């Protein structure tokens, strides 16, 4: 008797789409029940989105372990929870382990929450899932959904958070801080969010503020493009933060040169600090190289200061350079120029795309 294959046929996804049960069962005439889609995935048919209920039942009846892990230790229940599919209900009815985590400690409830599936979250809670289980990063399902929450998912996050709290999930001070940050991020990007989502997101945000006793973040005031730009009293850091909120758009370059000389060091700092320079390319270098030109417009900085800027930007993202200090200095020089040039200067289309 010929040895059966350990991998699924290449056309398996197409067979799932067609949904012909006899053809799907016939796959296992030549394949092991544990056949998967590759050694760096190890996803069996039970892990696939769109797997028919009849095939799920048949495979388990034939002896396939309902909790079989893939390459990352994820069970079929875990994968179906990511997708928010009703297959979750079937797998639990057939005996799936509701708490079995992947290799990183995430449970199916973590995934249903992180991928914003309120119905799946409710179902898992009703079936007894532990709402305070922690993954390897020490995050509960509630902490996890707050961590990944962005813009258009605020309403789902609020609904999920409410369910988890009602089921006994514990609140922490870090969660409160995270809700405040969600509010700040939303207000900063409000202008770029599609109008169809605004009302629902606002209601969700109000719910999050209520659930975590957070003072609502004020709506952002932005520059009108024509009025003089005034700096607040305070440290250069406070002045920089004020202008960042006032002049920087949700995405893309600023409308004014004043805004752009604030945006560039901030954008570069984010890439180097948060992203480790993984996406560093010519456009980042072009952004920096544009600074001397921008700061020479209108009432220019001194020749000595412009020369200093050139030296500073030449050293950024080079070996053994203190990028933090270099970017701080760029911010300070940008603020000095803005003080000399309060009247907005329209920004011409830049040569970079960052």
Tell where the protein language model's regions lie, with residue ranges.
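N-terminal segments that cap or nucleate solenoid repeat domains
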Residues: 2-48, 54-59
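Hydrophobic, helix-prone linear segments
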Residues: 26-27, 39-80, 87-93
